[in-house]
Amino acid sequence: NLRVVTNSINVASICARNSSFDVVVACGTVRHRDNGIVGASAERFIREFRVDYGIIGISGIDEEGNLLDYDYREVAVARTIIECSRRVFLVTDRSKFGRPAMVRVAHLSDINALFTDGPIDTKWADLIHEHGVELFMV
């Protein structure tokens, strides 16, 4: 049995197909471009939990190891997920390395593992390992 706490309608819909999953969905404002649930209500809801694994996504990673996004509302939710998780996994595709964005979510040192969609430049792999983050290229 697995309990999934999410701020994503899409993730909830996929997980709900498995009857052994207990799916808990945050309340808040639906962001139409990706069906993410954001806002103060979502943050307060997520803050009620202490989860083993938190999974976040981002819009960019800069050369200092800052994790970046464009939507300040999603950033607040991602920060809350980081605070409430024993281990934090970042899932991002290769295009996000070196991509600028306006709002800082966190730093590489705040996550435990990074999952990406294939080989990345050595400078990025070195930066990731330098901060003690496990790197998985899948």
For each predicted feature, which ranges?
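Conserved SAM-binding loop
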Residues: 4-5
